[in-house]
């Protein structure tokens, strides 16, 4: 019976064939007696209780067996039999009389059952009623048929107790067998699993006592019943009754097996035959081969043939050991007994008994976890064809129960086992569809990402095997589940299936009516999911077939809460957007969930659908999703999806009557120009999930005709169903090589091309997810031009690229909103773009890749496959190139869909470099616009013009690795792209539309534009620092990503000396850069794949040079850039001069090729050499240049610092102390100009920070990136937070604690680059958030002070800057306390000690420190003045004190490393202070000795010594209070750790001692309140030890009584806001008590601090009163705080609540009403 509950829970639903209702008959001639009234209660007056006769139990058979008919007598007959058998109530004993009287007068049978149940113990477990027992049994049987669920449960419980009281000996009473056994068998078909279980347990007890009668009843009333549901239930549950113990009694199962075998020949009810055959299999497994064969041999020949035929069709040659039968009967000799024993040891025929027992071991979770792992291995060898149906059902039942396990690993492993089982079953899973879905539904409410991924795999596999409609039919039965999360996930799975499978696979009308009730669900999330589902349904139905959809909506709108749902659905459809699938298969909603009516993001337009969502109950939960991402803002089904995109796809349809997902017919533009932009606009980066169908493996040959085949692409890939064809989506490939190896595999090879539709914009646009592209190609120029509404891409005929890039790892980043540019292509490749004014702003996008060039001699000219949009070009003089306007491009400009992931970028071959067009502005002006034309002709000399180009010889750079890892190439070459890209974005403000940051740049292609006179330092740089003649008339713009400065790739960059290793001093740079995509939101701009330094005797028209810091720099001057006079008449071969008058944008760092400008004027042709830059190469270069770099660097440092140190030497100690905070101008200037030391490749400069257009989404993405294990992503996330702090501080403040915690964790990161980026991020947080960081000082300062002991100079330097920013911006009092608490106590006091030396220190305190904090600061200063700084602690020596800055080569001295230089001076100051301290009357030696003693005891390793120290401290506080008060900070700094000691005894003693000391010390505790409260509260109020919890509560209460409550206000507010569990409740209640006492004295401060906590509690509290992630019910505490504030503030509280989101005000009003009602 152990397995009975599990199997019962998974009974498949059987159809209700008929209903049965007992009809009452009346006898008018019979007078109504008391007994008949009892029957009347059970018959008529009990209709309220027994209305299940036609409802709950309407599936009873229409006709019953004769035995049942005889038993189910009218109630009058029952009552009369009671009267007759009793002979009157007076004839029974007194107890029977009382119970009978209760049955007469009870309002319902449940009271009678309870009375009978209570009487059982007094009767020794016996029922009594010796003369009325038969009538009683019949009445109970009537209840089992007619009664409601509760009555049946009570009746079965009573019968179970009675049978257990009678024991197992002896036969069943005849009355019991006749009256109750048939009704118990009928109960086996109950829908309620609990009732089935109880009935089965009673039958099991009866089977032991009267097996013959029970088996006969099971056959007659169950297996041979006219009710098909009852027959199936009996057959399914019968094997469960036949346990091993019962079989040992020698039960004769002949009739049972014959009855089951009869059903095998019934072909009309195949399902019933299958159930019967499964029952026989399970019985055979339990009987063993010998006994089962004996039963089968006794079957009639016809039945035996049916059985053998079924056996062969089911198992074929693989017959289980207990079914190994000959066709004509049985073998004479059974199989060896050993086989039987070994196989009988298998539970469910699958798993060993020992493993089964360990799976159910509730004592040791590790044992269960290991057992689940072993179960996976067992299932890997499992053959479903050799396992009986019933065994598999039992096995699924086991998995069903395991999914209830409290251990996550067990649940996750069980899901994996279930998934593996579904895979192994294949198409056979259809037989077990119900149980598998029932088990899977159990975990739908789980919000963990891995759980979501696992059950999505299960459902998708089920849909693949049996079709989506069958799965959804069973799944939608759970749409009324009590858990709203389950309901939401059910709808989401429906959306996923609709987006994955064609509409022909669904019954869309039925699906619409099934999903419609979710539209009026009480929960917002379910409503939103339903709206998204209806959008997909409308898409699947088409525009002309949506009437059924609206009929379904009409049906639910008529409900009580359905008013407005039709408007909501129509508004949702009018948005013309569809949800889509992410990489993991989760659903990403198109419309975000508005958190409140006033807090919607500006990108979400107000509408009836959003109002409908807001009308639902708020059920916000903790956001992990994403982080668990923030589901309210992200709405990615699965919440923790790394692919976050809030830009939704616009519809291609323009007609008013068209739905957003309708296909557009291809239009004709120009000559045979197919427009695909309408289709492509519907696609976005994550519409393309990784799939083997969309990847080309590495090494796949690509030829001229390579393109996607015409096959249907499921909707999870493309939002419209348009097929890809060679006309729309070709892969350009051809050239001199016959085949080409294209690298297209790797992780997350997402194919997105919403970016290539010709739109530009910021985060809100489709272009925000641009990445990098990769291909391998030699000797080919490639360029890309996107014309108006024309879908084009770049790529030559031997390359396969994508116009939008790939991030280095899965996911995409959201970048700040920057203006974007649209650089043109070369007139030698495409004639100048001429675009209409209307389309120019949105649709002119150009991408250019630059790859190194060897020579273009001999390269065949590719034939274009399409006509292209032409451009109008003009030379620098304004003369139009008419002959070029008809040219055709050398490459096909249509979208290429395949791209390789950035993580596997490589340089196995060089890549074509597009020449920059001459006479075309790379950044369009706002003035003139042109018209659209077409190219007619392609010049023959295009492929000959670069003939003379030769690369610069860089062979001496010693790059010996020719087969560099492709994965390394991507990240190292990113830096040049980013540094230039960010600078141009910074400079593009003059030409961007200031009114709309998301708008694209306006085009201007005429040379008469006023932009021609723009500053050279703006228009002289292409995106990667490329300088060309054309760039003299261009402006630049791009979107910066995390900064990667070239100085870390070429360590000699910057203003430092730049020795060259080039062999020839007579070289010219020809072309070494690459333009990034002109779209404005690239998380990782296109990478430069390689460099090619070429030389020419004279720069050609299309030649470019790299400029930037250090290009023509010298030892003594900052790098300069070329002005417009740099290049003069290079067309004629003239030499050019350099003008070093203009500073380039900071951060554009080029390669300093030569220090002498004249070396560029004489050029020789030399052998070309390509340089492939990668991570490994970059490290090698730095290694080889290390000595050289350090040599120049140290010389420069020493030269510049020499005067500084000398000036410092003559300055007074106080002046030196102040200067230690601010380095000299020379040092500062030097550090600013030394990017290799002060800037890492990933950290963005302050000047490069830009605002986000969607800061809420960016914040969520930043937290997700910080949680990623990839260190580069962590740095990206830190840069995001810096941007948010600079421009969106109000958004950042909403999650400041969570963000700060994440940043602090990265400060501890072992990778120095990440650690340093986190320190810089903290510095910016202090700078921009100012006093908002007060609450976070304890954690941030502690980690910064710890980090100050690092050996890396640059980290110490940044830590100093961060601490300086902290001191300058946060509340001074909090800063001082945090510094003292930060672990570096001596140095914290030392900083305050230095500040005291300032002559205006007290004035500054009074000016900047709030009056309420001023007394405490002055007390701290006074203590320092009296006692001095003290000696440096011997037990915690400073790491910096042991370090010598002169011993570290290449270190840049800063304030942190120059402390040793001040050492002697500081000691002098200390000695002066010590002299002052000696004048204090207290014996300083005694005080120091006492401190050493007491702190030694408090910090002792032995817990007994620590307890003695605590007791000693209490004794000293009582007897020598002055000594303790004089050293209170130092003493309690050691004592606070004992308040949360790991030893519970020490912890408890410390708390009790603290409780006693508080009344003694009282206000003397004020300097240490901020350190005490966290130590008292954080762990202790959540302690499971009742003693510790009570002691902590007493300490908090004592603090409230004896310490100024104003000092407690801020710490209590902080703890009430950020603690969780019981501690949060307690601190909130204490805060309410403080408000009551403090408000009259400090009203403004109380409101300022406490209201923040109240809004936090009200805003995050769910309907159940709990907080996400906090645990426990906070409603009562919140109500108390609300009441306290309302009592003090009155109506003003409600007025201030009106400025908060509506749900906060609503919650406040509800709580206030609740408290008022409670008082009444």
From Swiss-Prot:
Domain of life: Eukaryota
HEAT repeat boundaries on the chain: 175-212, 214-247, 251-289, 345-384, 390-427, 431-466, 467-504, 506-543, 1294-1331, 1335-1372, 1485-1522, 1526-1563, 1567-1605
Stored Gene3D superfamilies: Leucine-rich Repeat Variant
Residue spans of biased composition, Polar residues class: 794-809, 819-829, 842-852, 868-877, 1073-1087, 1446-1458
Positions of the UniProt region annotated as Disordered: 794-924, 970-998, 1067-1087, 1430-1462
One of the record's GO cellular component terms: cilium
Region TOG 1, residue ranges: 94-312
Family, similarity comment: Belongs to the Crescerin family.
Domain notes: The TOG regions are composed of HEAT-type repeats that assemble into a solenoid structure. They mediate interaction with microtubules.
Protein name according to UniProt: TOG array regulator of axonemal microtubules protein 1
Protein source organism: Homo sapiens
């Amino acid at each position: 019976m152990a397995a009975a509950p599990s199997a019962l829970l998974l009974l498949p639903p059987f159809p209700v064939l008929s209903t049965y209702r007992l009809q009452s008959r009346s006898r008018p001639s019979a007078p109504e007696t008391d007994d008949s009234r009892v029957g009347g209660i059970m018959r008529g007056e009990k209709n309220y209780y027994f209305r299940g006769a036609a409802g709950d139990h309407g599936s009873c058979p229409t006709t019953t067996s004769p035995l049942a008919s005889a038993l189910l007598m009218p109630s009058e007959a029952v009552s009369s039999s009671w009267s007759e058998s009793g002979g009157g109530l007076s004839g029974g004993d007194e107890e029977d009389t009382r119970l009978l009287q209760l049955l007469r007068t009870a309002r319902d049978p449940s009271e009678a059952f309870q009375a009978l149940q209570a009487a059982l113990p007094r009767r020794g477990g016996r029922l009594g009623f010796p003369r009325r027992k038969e009538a009683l049994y019949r009445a109970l049987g009537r209840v089992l048929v007619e009664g409601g669920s509760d009555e049946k449960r009570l009746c079965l419980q009573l019968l179970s107790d009675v049978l257990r009281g009678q024991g197992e000996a002896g036969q069943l009473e005849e009355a019991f067998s006749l009256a109750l056994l048939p009704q118990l068998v009928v109960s086996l078909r109950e829908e309620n699993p609990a009732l089935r279980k109880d009935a089965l347990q009673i039958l099991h007890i009866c089977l032991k006592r009267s097996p013959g009668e029970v088996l006969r009843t099971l056959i007659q009333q169950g297996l041979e019943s006219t009710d098909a549901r009852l027959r199936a239930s009996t057959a399914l549950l019968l094997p469960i009754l036949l346990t091993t113990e019962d079989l040992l009694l020698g039960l004769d199962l002949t009739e049972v097996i014959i009855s089951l075998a009869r059903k095998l020949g019934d072909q009309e009810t195949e399902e019933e035959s299958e159930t019967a055959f499964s029952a026989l299999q399970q019985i055979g497994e339990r009987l063993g081969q010998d006994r089962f064969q004996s039963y089968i041999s006794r079957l009639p020949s016809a039945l035996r043939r049916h059985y053998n035929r079924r056996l062969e069709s089911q198992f074929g040659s693989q017959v289980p050991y207990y079914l190994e039968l000959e066709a004509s009967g049985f073998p004479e000799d059974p199989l060896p007994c050993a086989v039987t024993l070994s196989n009988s040891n298998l539970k469910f025929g699958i798993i060993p008994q020992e493993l089964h027992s360990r799976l159910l071991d509730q004592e040791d979770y590790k044992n269960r976890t290991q057992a689940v792992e072993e179960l996976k291995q067992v299932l890997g060898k499992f053959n479903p064809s050799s396992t009986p149906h019933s065994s598999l059902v039992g096995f699924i039942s086991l998995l069903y129960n395991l999914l209830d396990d409290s251990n996550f690993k067990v649940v996750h492993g069980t899901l994996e086992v279930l998934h593996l089982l579904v895979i192994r079953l294949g198409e056979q899973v259809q037989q077990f569809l119900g149980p598998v879905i029932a088990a899977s539904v159990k975990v739908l409410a789980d919000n963990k990402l891995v759980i979501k991924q696992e059950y999505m795999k299960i459902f998708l596999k089920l849909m693949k095997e049996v079709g989506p409609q069958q799965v959804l039919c069973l799944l939608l039965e759970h749409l009324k589940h009590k858990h709203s999360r389950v309901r939401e996930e059910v709808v989401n799975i429906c959306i996923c299936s609709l987006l994955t499978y064609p509409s022909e696979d669904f019954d869309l009308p039925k699906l619409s009516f099934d999903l419609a009730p979710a539209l009026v669900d009480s929960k917002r999330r379910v409503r939103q999911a339903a709206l998204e589902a209806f959008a997909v349904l409308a898409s699947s139905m088409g525009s002309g077939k949506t009437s059924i959809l609206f009929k379904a909506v009409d049906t639910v709108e008529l409900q009580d809460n359905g008013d407005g749902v039709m408007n909501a659905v129509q508004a949702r459809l009018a948005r013309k957007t569809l949800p889509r699938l992410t990489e993991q298969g989760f659903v990403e909603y198109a419309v975000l969930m508005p958190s409140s009516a006033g807090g919607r993001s500006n990108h979400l337009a107000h509408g009836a659908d959003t109002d409908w969502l807001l009308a639902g109950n708020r059920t916000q939960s903790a956001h992990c999703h994403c982080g668990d991402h923030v589901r309210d803002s992200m709405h990615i089904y699965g919440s923790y999806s790394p692919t976050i995109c809030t830009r939704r796809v616009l519809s291609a349809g323009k007609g008013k009557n068209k739905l957003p997902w309708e296909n557009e017919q291809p239009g004709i533009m120009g000559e045979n120009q197919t427009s695909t932009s309408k289709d492509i606009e519907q696609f976005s980066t994550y519409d393309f999930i990784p799939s083997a169908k969309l990847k080309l493996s590495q090494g796949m040959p690509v030829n001229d005709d390579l393109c996607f085949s015409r096959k249907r692409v499921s909707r999870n890939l493309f939002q419209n169903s348009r097929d890809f064809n060679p006309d729309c989506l070709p892969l350009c490939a051809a050239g001199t090589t016959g085949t080409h190896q294209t690298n297209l595999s790797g992780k997350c090879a997402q194919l997105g091309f919403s970016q290539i539709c010709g739109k530009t914009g910021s985060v809100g646009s489709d272009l925000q997810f641009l990445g990098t592209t990769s291909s391998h190609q030699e000797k080919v120029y490639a360029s890309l031009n996107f014309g108006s509404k024309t879908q084009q891409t770049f790529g030559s005929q031997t390359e396969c690229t994508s116009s939008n890039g790939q991030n280095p790892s899965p996911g995409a980043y959201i970048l700040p909103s920057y203006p974007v540019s649209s650089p043109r292509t070369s007139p030698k490749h495409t004639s100048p773009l001429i675009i209409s004014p209307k389309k120019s702003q949105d649709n002119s996008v150009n991408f250019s890749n630059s790859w190194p060039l060897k020579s273009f001699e001999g390269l065949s000219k590719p034939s274009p496959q399409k006509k292209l949009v032409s451009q109008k070009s003009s030379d620098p003089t304004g003369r139009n190139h008419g002959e070029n306007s008809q040219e055709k491009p050398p490459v096909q400009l249509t979208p290429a869909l395949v791209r390789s992931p950035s993580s596997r970028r490589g340089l196995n071959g060089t890549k074509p470099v597009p020449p920059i067009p001459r006479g075309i502005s790379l950044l369009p002006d706002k003035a003139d616009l042109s018209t659209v034309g077409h190219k007619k002709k392609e010049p023959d000399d295009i492929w000959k013009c670069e003939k003379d180009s030769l690369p610069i010889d860089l062979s001496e750079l010693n790059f010996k690795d020719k087969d560099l890892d492709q994965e390394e190439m991507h990240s190292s070459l990113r830096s040049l792209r980013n540094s230039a890209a960010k600078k141009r974005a910074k400079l593009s403000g003059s030409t961007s539309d200031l009114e709309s940051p998301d708008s694209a740049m306006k085009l201007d292609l005429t040379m008469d534009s006023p932009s021609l006179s723009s500053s050279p330092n703006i228009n002289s740089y292409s995106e990667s620092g490329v300088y060309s003649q054309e760039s003299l008339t261009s402006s630049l713009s791009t979107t910066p990503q995390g900064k990667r400065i070239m100085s870390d790739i070429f360590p000699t960059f910057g203003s430092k000396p730049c020795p060259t290793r080039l062999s020839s001093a007579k070289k010219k740079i020809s072309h070494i850069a690459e333009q990034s995509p002109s779209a404005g939101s690239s998380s990782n701009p296109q990478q430069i794949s390689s460099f090619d330094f070429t030389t020419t005797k004279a720069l050609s028209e299309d030649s470019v040079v790299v400029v930037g810091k250090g290009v023509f720099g010298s030892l003594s001057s900052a790098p300069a850039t070329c002005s417009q006079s740099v290049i003069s008449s290079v067309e004629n071969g003239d030499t050019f001069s350099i003008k070093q008058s203009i500073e380039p944008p900071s951060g554009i760092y080029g390669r300093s090729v030569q220090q002498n400008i004249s070396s560029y004027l004489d050029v020789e042709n030399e052998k070309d050499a390509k340089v492939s830059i990668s991570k490994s190469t970059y490290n090698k270069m730095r290694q080889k240049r290390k000595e050289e770099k350090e040599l120049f660097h140290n010389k420069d440092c020493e030269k510049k610092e020499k005067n500084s140190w000398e000036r410092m030497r003559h300055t007074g100690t106080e002046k030196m102390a102040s200067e230690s905070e601010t380095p000299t101008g020379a040092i500062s200037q030097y550090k600013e100009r030394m990017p290799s030391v002060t800037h890492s490749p990933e950290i963005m400069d302050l000047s490069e920070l830009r605002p986000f257009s969607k800061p809420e989404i960016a914040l969520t993405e930043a937290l997700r990136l910080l949680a990623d294990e990839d260190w580069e992503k962590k740095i990206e996330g830190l840069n995001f937070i810096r941007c948010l702090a600079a421009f969106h501080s109000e958004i950042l403040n909403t999650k400041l604690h969570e963000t700060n915690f994440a940043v602090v964790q990265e400060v501890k990161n072992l990778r120095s680059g990440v650690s340093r980026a986190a320190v810089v991020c903290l510095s910016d947080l202090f700078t921009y958030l100012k006093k908002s960081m007060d609450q976070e000082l304890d954690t941030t300062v502690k980690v910064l002070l710890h980090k100050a002991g690092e050996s890396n100079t640059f980290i110490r330097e940044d830590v100093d800057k961060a601490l300086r920013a902290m001191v300058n911006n946060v509340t001074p009092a909090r800063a001082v306390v945090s510094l003292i608490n930060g672990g570096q106590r001596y140095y914290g006091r030392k900083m305050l000690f230095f500040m005291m030396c300032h002559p205006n220190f007290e004035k500054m305190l009074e000016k900047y420190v709030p009056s309420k904090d001023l007394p405490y600061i002055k007390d701290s200063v006074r203590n320092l003045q009296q006692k001095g700084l003290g000696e440096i602690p011997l037990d915690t020596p400073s790491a910096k004190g042991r370090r010598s800055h002169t011993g570290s080569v290449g270190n840049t001295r800063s304030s942190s490393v120059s402390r040793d230089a001040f050492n002697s001076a500081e000691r002098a100051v200390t000695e002066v202070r010590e002299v002052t301290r000696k004048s204090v009357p207290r014996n300083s030696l005694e005080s120091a000795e006492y401190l050493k003693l007491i702190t030694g005891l408090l910090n002792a390793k032995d817990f007994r010594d620590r307890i003695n120290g605590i007791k000693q401290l209490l004794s000293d506080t009582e007897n020598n209070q002055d000594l303790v008060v004089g050293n209170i900070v130092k003493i309690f700094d050691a004592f606070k750790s004992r308040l949360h000691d790991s030893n519970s005894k020490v912890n408890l003693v410390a708390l009790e001692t603290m409780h006693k000391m508080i009344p003694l010390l009282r206000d003397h505790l004020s300097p240490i309140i901020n350190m005490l409260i966290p130590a008292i509260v954080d762990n202790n109020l959540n302690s499971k030890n009742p003693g510790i919890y009570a002691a902590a509560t007493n300490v908090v209460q004592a603090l409230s009584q004896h310490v100024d409550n104003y000092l407690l206000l801020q710490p209590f507010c902080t703890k009430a806001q950020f603690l969780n569990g019981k501690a949060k409740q307690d601190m909130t209640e204490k805060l309410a008590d403080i408000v009551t006492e403090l408000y009259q004295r400090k009203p403004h401060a109380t409101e300022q601090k406490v209201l923040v906590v109240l809004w936090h509690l009200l805003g995050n509290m769910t309907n159940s009163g709990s907080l996400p992630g906090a645990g426990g019910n906070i409603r009562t505490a919140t109500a108390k705080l609300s009441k306290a504030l309302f009592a003090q503030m009155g109506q003003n509280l409600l007025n201030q609540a009106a400025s908060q989101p509506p749900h906060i005000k609503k919650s406040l009003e509800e709580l206030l009403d609740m408290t008022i009602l409670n008082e009444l």
